[in-house]
Amino acid sequence: MVKKKLSKSEESDQSRINLKDDKDLIEQKIKKAKTDNDSIPSEINGLKNRYEAANLISIYANINEIEVARVLKEFGGKNFSTLKSKLSESLIERICPIGTEIKKLLKDKNYLNKILEQGSKKADIIAKNNLKEIYEIIGLTKFT
């Protein structure tokens, strides 16, 4: 089986973490994320030409709102299973509540229709004002 790095441009759903992914699926995707056999470097220059490693470390840093250097200091010398475990925990903590809310909202068709109607009314007002300004700028009069 060929392992691939997580990527939003890939067609496969297994290549990225989606907002609606549940806990088990997030863990599975992170476990299967491609890495190399070397341990995690403790300095940024140790990530040179280690794209998969850099990708996972970058995701961990971003989801936890910390610098890559801090991640390398924390995980340097350790194997990737340690980072993947912590990354899964962080992603689950951040993403699962969003997915739960999305699923809840998608079930409430009345609420969604109300939001769509409100948005349509706002867009209509903006469009009418823009059209009025355009007519004035180019010197046309609108016949009603």
Residue ranges, per PLM feature:
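Conserved nucleotide- and phosphate/pyrophosphate-binding catalytic cores
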Residues: M1-T144
